[in-house]
């Protein structure tokens, strides 16, 4: 009973396995022969669907069972698929099948198994692809076909190793001796998809490098082709001309000359191309250097401008300090010129010079007074040399705004109330001018001829309307006249004084304060000034005298007895001349200071 049960179980197992294997074999054969076209992806899939070694081991195990059941049947040779592992499995399975019994149906089943294995062997052989087809399959993936070849196609000796000769210890040595066993597994272990991808990327980069190196070669080849085409055209034309003249003789020496010429032209063209490349590289480098050099030039220019501004500020500060020193000693003024006699012609020359040189008369008087004061041990100190500071960045900056020029009601240009250099000695008035010109000496000269006296004081300003500017007489005075030699000498002297003392150009007229005098002093000064003006009017003519007297009469009617102040017409004239001539005083002072600073540098 036990033998029958074992036989039934073995039959059921074999039938199930046969059904499964037949389904696999039919599907493989149908899919392989169904596709007529050669599709690479499909072939790769079919190669992967071949029977695996595990399947073959299972089939061999079944055959071993059949052999134990019916020992008359011989086993097929499966060593090409699995090799030595079958030996150890055979020893294990022999003990299990000793009690199995024989039956008449076992022959049919063994035949079915043998036929099935033969069909599988044929399918494997047909599935093997030729080497040329393998090359076409793996060209796109940059995989060498040698790595994909199936080494099982090589036929080895069919001598099967005997079980008794080899022990389990020698199995590893035996597997190592045969280099073509399980080669597919070894190759798959060595070349993974990641390693293949890295190899592919390396080959692509090498191709790019080669492409960059070959660009120049391609250009040279194109140039050579163009030259060859030109040579062919020349050969044709020369051959035709030579055949017409010489009757078709050989053209070899001329061809050699043409070839030599073309070779020389090619060499020259190569040299020109190399030269142009070198020139482009030099131009690029020079452009970069030029951009780098422009920045330090700009920095140097900015530094120079800052240095000049700092120098100008230092000079202005020093001049202002000198003005402060002169302002601290206003009491030193004295009537040093009272001992000298001054003709009325000097007054006219002074006004004319101030008009022609556009310098206020007060500045001229100050310069003359300072020069004489220096001769007699005057108050001006010796001019010190200007020390330029070493570090120009430490110099304090001063604001030097432009002067705002505007016109008064009568149309004359007037300077603003805040001049460029405000620190100037104050208190210089018309009485100082009269005293400096020596009007007290002129009084004795004109008392004999003209004994007229002014009944009103002269040093106060007019409260009412000022005298109208005389049109014809002043137009004649404003006209430019040729200066005599004395006047030119005086002008040169004034220019020299201005060069030495530029601070005298900026007298502040709007901050003048009258110095208090006694009544007797005022009357004496009034008489002196009146006599000086009479002499001046006599020099200019009787017509001018009439205009001055009429204007003085109009002024006298508008004044009160003792409280109201009077002023001569010439004082108003001098003030207007000063207003007219001081319009460019600040600009000239600046220009002169800049010139001196540049000379000292």
From Swiss-Prot:
It is found in: Secreted. It holds the Pfam family Granin. The modification Sulfotyrosine is found at residue 151. Keywords: Cleavage on pair of basic residues, Secreted, Signal, Sulfation. One of its GO terms (cellular component) is extracellular space. Residues 258-273 have a biased composition (Basic and acidic residues). The keyword Ubl conjugation does not apply. Its main location: secreted. PANTHER family: SECRETOGRANIN II, SECRETOGRANIN-2. This is Secretogranin-2. It comes from Pelophylax ridibundus (Marsh frog).
């Amino acid at each position: 009973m036990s033998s029958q049960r074992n036989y039934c179980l073995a039959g059921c197992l074999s039938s199930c396995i046969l059904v499964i294997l037949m389904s696999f074999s039919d599907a493989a054969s149908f899919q392989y022969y169904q596709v007529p076209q050669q599709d690479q992806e499909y072939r790769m899939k079919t190669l992967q669907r071949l029977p695996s070694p595990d399947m073959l081991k299972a089939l061999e195990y079944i055959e071993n069972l059949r052999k134990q059941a019916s020992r008359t049947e011989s086993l097929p040779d499966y060593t090409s698929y699995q090799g030595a592992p079958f030996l150890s499995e055979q020893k294990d399975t022999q003990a299990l099948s000793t009690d199995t019994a024989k039956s008449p149906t076992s022959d049919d089943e063994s035949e079915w198994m043998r036929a099935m294995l033969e069909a599988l062997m044929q399918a494997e052989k047909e599935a093997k692809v030729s080497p040329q087809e393998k090359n076409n399959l793996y060209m796109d993936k940059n995989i060498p076909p040698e790595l994909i070849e199936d080494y099982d196609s090589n036929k080895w000796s069919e001598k099967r190793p005997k079980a008794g000769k080899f022990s389990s210890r020698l199995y590893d040595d035996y597997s190592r001796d045969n280099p073509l066993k399980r080669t597919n597994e070894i190759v798959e272990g060595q070349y993974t998809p990641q390693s293949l991808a890295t190899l592919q990327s390396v080959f692509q980069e090498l191709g790019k490098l080669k492409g960059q190196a070959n660009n120049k070669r391609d250009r040279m080849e194109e140039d050579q082709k163009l030259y060859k085409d030109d040579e062919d055209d020349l050969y044709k034309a020369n051959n035709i001309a030579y055949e017409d003249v010489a009757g078709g003789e050989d053209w070899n020496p001329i061809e050699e000359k043409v070839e030599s010429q073309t070779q020389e032209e090619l060499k020259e063209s190569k040299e020109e191309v190399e030269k142009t490349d070198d020139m482009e590289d030099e131009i690029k480098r020079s452009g970069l250097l030029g951009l780098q050099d422009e920045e330090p030039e700009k920095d140097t220019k900015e530094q120079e401008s800052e240095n000049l501004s700092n120098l100008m500020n230092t000079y202005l500060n020093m001049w202002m300090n000198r003005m402060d020193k002169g302002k601290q000693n206003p009491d030193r003024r004295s009537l040093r010129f009272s001992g000298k006699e001054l003709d009325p012609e000097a007054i006219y020359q002074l006004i004319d010079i101030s008009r022609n040189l556009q310098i206020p008369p007060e500045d001229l008087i100050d310069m003359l007074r300072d020069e004489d004061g220096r001769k007699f041990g005057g108050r001006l100190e010796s001019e010190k040399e200007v020390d330029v500071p070493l570090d120009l960045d430490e110099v304090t900056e001063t604001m030097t705004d432009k002067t705002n020029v505007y016109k008064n009601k009568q149309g004359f240009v007037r300077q603003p109330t805040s001049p460029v250099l405000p620190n100037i000695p104050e208190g210089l008035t018309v009485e100082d001018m009269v005293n400096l010109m020596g009007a007290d000496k002129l009084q004795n000269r004109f008392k004999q001829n003209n004994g007229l006296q002014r009944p009103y004081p002269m040093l106060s300003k007019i409260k009412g309307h000022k005298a109208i500017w005389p049109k014809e007489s002043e137009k004649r005075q404003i006209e430019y006249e040729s200066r005599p030699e004395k006047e030119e000498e005086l002008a040169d002297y004034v220019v020299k004084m201005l060069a030495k003392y530029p601070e005298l150009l900026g007298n502040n007229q709007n901050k003048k304060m009258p110095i208090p005098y006694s009544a007797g002093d005022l009357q004496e000064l009034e008489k002196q000034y009146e006599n000086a003006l009479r002499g001046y009017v006599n020099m200019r003519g009787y017509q001018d005298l009439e205009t001055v007297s009429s204007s003085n009469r109009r002024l006298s009617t508008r004044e009160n007895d003792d409280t109201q102040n009077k002023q001569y017409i010439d004082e108003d004239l001098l003030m207007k001349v000063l207003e007219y001539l001081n319009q460019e005083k600040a600009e000239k002072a600046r220009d002169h200071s800049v010139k001196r600073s540049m000379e000292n540098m």
